A protein has these predicted regions:
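Compact alpha-helical subdomains of small soluble proteins
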Residues: 53-56, 61
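A general structural motif at alpha-helix termini
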Residues: 40-44, 59
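N-terminal acidic leader/helix
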Residues: 1-29, 34-35, 43-54
């Protein structure tokens, strides 16, 4: 599965907990938004993460 910023952004906008986690990553790690989104992808979606199925569903709609 490949990282797609547009799909990841949609997923974040649909889930408040992902949005909150994104903010937390930005502050704690001092990352800019794009890198924080990518980090969130690797922690919450990639490698059978809890949001992998929803991400794949959104990706199919693209």
């Amino acid at each position: 599965m490949k990282y797609n910023k547009a799909v990841m952004t949609k997923l974040i906008n649909q889930h408040r907990d992902l949005h909150d986690e994104l903010k937390k990553i930005k502050v704690e790690m001092g990352l800019e938004k794009n890198l924080a989104i990518k980090a969130l992808f690797h922690s919450a979606v990639a490698d059978n993460g809890p949001y992998m199925k929803e991400y794949q569903d959104l990706e199919r709609l693209q």
